[in-house]
């Protein structure tokens, strides 16, 4: 099957916009297609970007094109599928995964390091994300901007992401750029431009992100930041991953160097390369560029287990920017690779995925006590399969001001109870499993997304088998397993609730910024 970004359908859809290839709109759409991830947050960000930056005529065309592309992805056959994939470990500990995709003369690279929010030192909240930014500040050999010129000059794209259990750096470009990209990735694995100026610049950027995405946004990501802080008891799982300003301001160059030396080692990294390549040729190139990087001790994995939760946890917050109340509900989930993990993923999708989901139908359509429902396992910062420590099934519900929290919870509990007592219908189960599988296969058809998935799997499990096995294993999940999972995990004593309500405006004045 052709990858989505190079399929005739996708190319025709892009061409239909008739935008100059040098235009910003064209680049945004192409970047979105190349980096397509099946997550609600990516969709929301894309929609916001086109709403802000483009006139109505262009917005409509892009929206039609993007919607059609989603249909193309969802229509990919849900059948067992495995791409040719090989793996090798260098003498310095770097693990390399290569997967072939000859549908277009392009490649995707993902370098994932085994460091994320969860492992940040105490007193240095937000440091993993801050360091991700510093990785784009250049090195003595390749100053800031070189990476962008090499990749974007050929029509490619690059980015970085920090999550609970990994930080990844991704690039996609024409195959002619493979050697320069490998050289640059090796160069920044060897050293960085450690300067107070770079630290100050990126600290300011991260703090501005916090202001824009948290302090000055309705709800302030409370379902992603505040909820884990209430649901978990230990620092690795409960602290604010975006970072407290006092911790960010306290970061020193010595902290940056120590963090880099400890976590950005070859033995703590997995590089996956997917595209128009031959494994042995890629292994030789990686050995050429990365083989001389000295090995360093790999940091031990700390224990991040949580003590059992024995009672429901409930709290309330006020929000100066929200106009209607919001409710966040989190249930603790089974560990990664647990026998219950697949049933957890399916249950999360049955409850939250789309307007046919159990919660949308019960709360929005039938009882009319909610305006919107979203959520899932490991939501919103990951997939149900990519975590290496405690995580939650999250429900984020926005509800009308004339409805009470108890009314929302009564309808919510009724929907969950019905699933726990009766399980899903076979028709509902077949529908959601088919959608999950087609989404996963469609995702794997895009080289950069496959590279990302492969690198995460090897980082967590030591092999890439789960990338190709999970879609097939999903088809074996039964209604009885979903019913048993809901009865075991979706219980009141295993959940945490935060109710966030609009704050009253100050008397005689306008509301100030800051959503918390």
Task: Please provide the spans of the model-predicted regions.
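Histidine-acidic residue clusters that define the catalytic metal-binding segment
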Residues: 79-89, 228-269, 279, 301-306, ...
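Bacterial N-terminal signal peptides that target proteins for export
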Residues: 40, 44-65
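Short hydrophobic alpha-helical segments enriched in small aliphatic residues
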Residues: 15, 25-27, 33, 39
